[in-house]
């Protein structure tokens, strides 16, 4: 698939832009702070409904504006769809497909599949479990868009149950008055059922994803660092001893009864952790507490991998995701944000080899020399200037290209 055209309005430093793209490689060149990363961020947002840089939408709305707009026309196997999302300060976002409003923004998920590799990805190896959970869930919803609804339902139940745990703890500390404690505990059992039902679906999806991803990860790491220890991944579940260890083995093939089994195990672990959860007032069981274990040889990558090995593992995770989506039947758009300058010659060559096979690659770089020579690319310059309306970015064709740039009044 490829993005044929995309548009921005009041998205970070871009006040208004419409840009036509073609398959192949396109490079956005500009100094740091001039807005080139914002271009990839906008397309990444259309793909995942999240930013690789910030955890909330507000920073993506240009200062002084009430909303931001990002839209793209995507061509996939000859079929063309246009999607757009409006980020509205203090309100729910709105989305459209071919100019028809959707009931929920998440309905656009899956139309634009992308994989982005950025300097922030080092946190996949060195950061908290939440970074790796997010990696899994974004890849999962890209493959299976309906999983976004499962995740949203799980998060909603988790918030409700967490609030109830705090209430239960307070009620039990006061002692039972008029059956208050019994009522709270009965209500908690109901929410246990909801959490187990949605959590089992999400957990089953993640486990299947790790099974499918593992061989691509091993191969990607081997191609990037052939002299290093072999790389592997394994899912670490908070269900603990309630879950058969076989279920987290990446070699295990998922079965049709997995969700039912996981829901049963979920209930068992919740019952065992009930007192501890009430005492602490937090939910200690579920996919929100899980992790993706990254292993080099027999050692965890976090804390044991060198800087170079950490970069190789982070890059391998992204390339494995790219290979998996491609194996599913469609080339995702590959986006590389200022990463070639961070890599040594071998890793640059390995990344360039994969990029050369992608249907569309979008790259940001500070100078042309940061981009490997083997990637023949159309190039655009990105410049920003300070105005009375704040810092505004503009894009200017450089070199030989027949692509069209439109600046709206």
Swiss-Prot record:
HAMAP family noted in UniProt: RecF
GO cellular component, one term: cytoplasm
Record NCBIfam families: recf
Compartmental location: Cytoplasm
Binding-site residues for ATP, renumbered to this chain: 30-37
Record's keyword terms, sorted: ATP-binding, Cytoplasm, DNA damage, DNA repair, DNA replication, DNA-binding, Nucleotide-binding, SOS response
GO terms for MF: ATP binding; single-stranded DNA binding
Origin: domain of life: Bacteria
Function: The RecF protein is involved in DNA metabolism; it is required for DNA replication and normal SOS inducibility. RecF binds preferentially to single-stranded, linear DNA. It also seems to bind ATP.
Disulfide links within the chain: none
Protein name per UniProt: DNA replication and repair protein RecF
Main location: cytoplasm
PANTHER family: DNA REPLICATION AND REPAIR PROTEIN RECF
InterPro entries: DNA-binding_RecF, DNA-binding_RecF_CS, P-loop_NTPase, RecF/RecN/SMC_N, RecF_2
Protein family: Belongs to the RecF family.
GO biological process, one term: DNA replication
Gene3D superfamilies xref list: P-loop containing nucleotide triphosphate hydrolases (3.40.50.300), RecF/RecN/SMC, N-terminal domain (1.20.1050.90)
Gene that encodes it: recF
Listed Pfam families: SMC_N (PF02463)
